[in-house]
Regions:
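Unchanged
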Residues: 48-71, 77-131
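Conserved beta-strand in the GNAT
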Residues: 183, 189-198, 213, 218
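A short beta-loop-alpha structural element at the N-terminal edge
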Residues: 137-150
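Conserved Nudix-box catalytic region and its N-terminal flanking loop in Nudix hydrolases
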Residues: 24-63
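Acidic, metal-coordinating catalytic segment for phosphate/diphosphate chemistry
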Residues: 1-20
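Conserved acetyl-CoA-binding loop-helix of GNAT-fold acetyltransferases
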Residues: 53-59, 219, 225-238, 265
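Conserved active-site alpha-helix within GNAT-family acetyltransferase domains
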Residues: 230, 242, 254-273
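Conserved GNAT acetyl-CoA-binding A-motif
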Residues: 240-252
């Protein structure tokens, strides 16, 4: 079996048989279960005679989820080859209002942050959702409305901090001229963040001042390998450049091989290795 993706419009709409709609409501992805099945799937269905593929998506989204108000975005066209090749269009829906589930083949609607384990099409649906995640990413600078997801992710990166400590620290950054953060938003969900600062004291390996500094960077596990960290870093670098910086510093824990590989892959050079000591007195 092979799944391929194309730009919207590359495939003749007359050849399309399916519309698949990756939908979010209340900060969670929506999955549906048909009455005759015990597995979950992304909403979608067959194109009916006389419908455009966008009309198919709108109808299927309502019939399978009860969505009443939503914004529908075309993501891409796709094909699935398994003996024969079938074509469809992938959509993203940001649902603002849901009503009762209409009478249809759907028995249950599930809202959660990630794919269920029991999938109707396990070889196809993870690829479709991944494509949506790659396509609808948006990098935003933090404001007060982002504090809750920022704190939640910050505690995963720095688990030794309490909620109150993290909340206080991040609120201070909101009002700082020397430090800020950027979040990656995927629809209604937040998938990662970078916290950057301007340092005027010596930064290991630098030969300029001031220097931009990565105070922390984190991507939720299920959103890794989607290019999010690189996009966050690029946005942080532009912020530092606008403030007169020509270099960017960072540091990692010595055992963190994945973080080391990321830093070297995006152009950082190792400047030094430092071992820190502490003792109780």
């Amino acid at each position: 079996m092979e799944v391929r993706f194309y730009s919207v419009g590359d495939i003749d709409e007359k050849a399309m048989r399916y519309a698949v709609i990756a939908a979010q409501h209340g900060g969670k992805w929506i999955f549906v279960k048909q009455k005759a099945r015990t597995t979950w799937e992304i909403p979608g269905g067959r194109n009916e005679q006389g419908e455009s593929i966008a009309q198919t998506a709108q109808r299927e989204l309502y019939e399978e989820t009860g969505a009443l108000q939503f914004v529908l975005t075309e993501v891409c066209d796709y094909s699935v080859t398994r003996g024969e090749t079938t074509y469809g269009r992938l959509f993203f829906a940001d649902i603002q209002q849901m009503g009762p589930l209409p009478e249809s083949e759907i028995s249950e609607v599930l809202l959660q942050e990630e794919l269920p384990r029991e999938l109707t099409y396990p070889d196809i649906q993870p690829l479709l959702l991944r494509r949506v995640k790659e396509t609808i990413q948006e990098i935003v600078e933090v404001t007060e409305e982002h504090v809750e997801p920022w704190v939640r992710m910050g505690l995963k990166l720095w688990p030794d901090h309490s909620f109150d400590e993290m909340h206080k620290s991040l609120l201070e950054i909101l009002h700082s001229e020397k430090e800020t953060a950027f979040l990656c938003r995927v629809g209604q969900l937040y998938a990662g963040f970078i916290q950057v600062s301007i340092r005027v004291d010596y930064v290991e390996g630098s030969d300029s001042s001031p220097v931009g500094y990565v105070e922390g960077i984190y991507v939720e596990e299920s959103y890794r390998m989607l290019g999010i960290a690189k996009k966050l870093l690029a946005r942080g670098e532009r912020w530092a450049q606008a403030r007169g910086c020509v270099q960017m510093g960072s540091d990692i824990e010595q055992h963190n091989a994945a973080s080391y590989d990321f830093h070297t892959s995006v152009g950082f050079e190792e400047a030094n290795r430092i071992i820190c000591f502490i003792k109780d007195i």
